Amino acid sequence: MSAKWEKKGTNDGELTFEIDLPQIQQGLDQAFQRVRKNLTVPGFRKGKVSRTVFKRMYGDAALYEDALNILLPDAYEAAVKESGIDPVDQPQINVDSMDEGKPWVIKATVTVKPEVTLGQYKGLEVPKQNVEVSAKDIDAELEKRREQQAELVVKDDKAAENGDTVVIDYVGTIDGTEFDGGSSKNYSLELGSNSFIPGFEEQLVGHKSGDEVTVNVTFPEDYKAADLAGKAAEFKTTIHEVKVKELPALDDDFAKDLDDDVDTLDELKAKIKKELTDQREEAAKNAVQEAAIKEATDNATIKEVPNAMIEQEVHNQMDQYLGNMQRQGISPKMYYQLTGTSEDDLHKQFEADAATRVRTNLVLEAIVKAEDIQPTEDQVNEEVKNLASEYNMDEKAVRKALSEDMLKHDIGVKQAIDIITDSAKEVESAKDDADKEASDAKADK
């Protein structure tokens, strides 16, 4: 095969290639076998006409279109490989010549991946992450866990405050008419939780059990039920009970009740400190990685990202997101109904930073090439094993879903990320230095 690539624009060009005579003959033979099945010729049973008779009656030209459709995919793929280009979209095919007895000449207009000129990607300076866990942090976590273990106790004759839970009946009306979803009985509502329409909870503060309260509110303009959005409503509300949170005492008994692995409050604090430290170290690692990758991407030069790549990235993200929803038993249709959104809304959501994601991927791929990263078969096997475990799939199913090239691509990108991240240097920002000096000065007084 003879293939020639001629660049026409930043990311576009023309790929000219030939389909040689032996290939053409094979294509014509296959096309004939397809056509003859439904062909009726006088003197022959349906589908039984010979190749010689067909050629005499219709000529090979009658098979050219079918033969080209048969041959084109493999011929184009071979031409792409020979020319070394990396297409990102379906080509526009134009037949240059299909003369009898000569190779067919095909011209394809192709959009390819843009060229990436790497800047610095090793030894990048990124903001230092604070992973220190203070006594204040531990106390805040303890308080959160006390809140989770709190009991709601009924308090007669107590005026409701934010943080209290009221048990209520309510009937909502708009212009004197009840509406769907506007009524409930024995509903438990935590005041200050902002779980009801803005203004509703505030009007129950200060009232006691047995009180009947008329609550007047206006539905937000962006309320998910469009028929209620922006409308004024009145809720006849009866308070049955006012409940107050009673927090458990912060002592050894609380610690043992909360965690079977500890016997004292001090042991619980030590365990919480380790948990918070582990969380912050993981978050710090992710933050360093994100900052280093962003800087490496910013340091690189890419003239223009093809729209086809951006659109493909959007669809990939949508497919992945909706696929995760389906694994949780939520179909795309159900998801759109539950969220009050549409496919267009989801498309816009992922479109917002699609170009940035594409640029990042291009830079990482360029680093893979620059570092001559070539994943081994053992690494591929390990990747398959990890994916099978993560998605609860059989390893054979993973290999069927992902080609060897795709697996090696993903492994290579991960190794490129490690190169960027492992060589990055964490440095104190000017603000961090100033804060530290102020803290040290305060401690010296």
Curated annotation (Swiss-Prot):
GO molecular function: peptidyl-prolyl cis-trans isomerase activity; protein folding chaperone; ribosome binding
Domain PPIase FKBP-type: from-to ranges: 163-248
Subcellular locations according to the entry: Cytoplasm
Pfam family, one: Trigger_N
Name of the protein in question: Trigger factor
Family: Belongs to the FKBP-type PPIase family. Tig subfamily.
Record text about domains: Consists of 3 domains; the N-terminus binds the ribosome, the middle domain has PPIase activity, while the C-terminus has intrinsic chaperone activity on its own.
Reactions catalysed, as given in the entry: [protein]-peptidylproline (omega=180) = [protein]-peptidylproline (omega=0)
Superkingdom per UniProt: Bacteria
Annotated function: Involved in protein export. Acts as a chaperone by maintaining the newly synthesized protein in an open conformation. Functions as a peptidyl-prolyl cis-trans isomerase.
Coarse class of the protein's main subcellular location: cytoplasm
This protein's UniProt keywords: Cell cycle, Cell division, Chaperone, Cytoplasm, Isomerase, Rotamase
Region Disordered, annotated ranges: 425-445
GO CC terms of this entry: cytoplasm
GO biological process: 'de novo' cotranslational protein folding; cell division; chaperone-mediated protein folding; protein transport; protein unfolding
Enzyme Commission (EC) number: 5.2.1.8
